[in-house]
Amino acid sequence: NMTVIPWTNADHFTCNEKFQGEFEVTLEIPAGGPYRIDTSLETKSTVPDLTWLYRGDCVLHLGVGNLFIIAGQSNSAGYSRDFCIDPPSMDVHLYRNRSKWDIASHPMNESTFARSLANEEMGVPGVSPYLAFGKTYGKMTGMPVGLIQTSLGGSPMERWNPKDGDLYLNMVDKIHETGG
């Protein structure tokens, strides 16, 4: 472990008398990772020169690198039923259908705990080439890779229509959810 960015003061906005509120800070994090971000609240004590730090939230396995959208049909969705040895890597993360980042692993288009969504598979997905792509690209660039899953096996082209296709609109929603 090493400190990349030291403790940084944030602007805070207290919303009510229960001290519930928000804080905002902009950090310049160098490409790479995985990083961990810790937050805490510093308060003054009644004893001079003594402060208390209250635990805040912690974000684990944060990578700053390249993002790719997985969109398309069978291969993108993982319809290969072949057995393969393709273990996960800490350098490749996947924005899963449940709208959470996770370490990328097969099956990549699984929908456990997902809300109803356009690209939910009816069958059990298998192996996708995109984990191997992410690992290879990450090794070539030396940077983490994030994959955003939006594919659906056997989907017709009209569902990808930018004007009103539900799969296209789902893809745009996922891009917005991840900060794009």
Predicted feature residues:
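Cell-envelope and extracellular/periplasmic
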Residues: 1-180
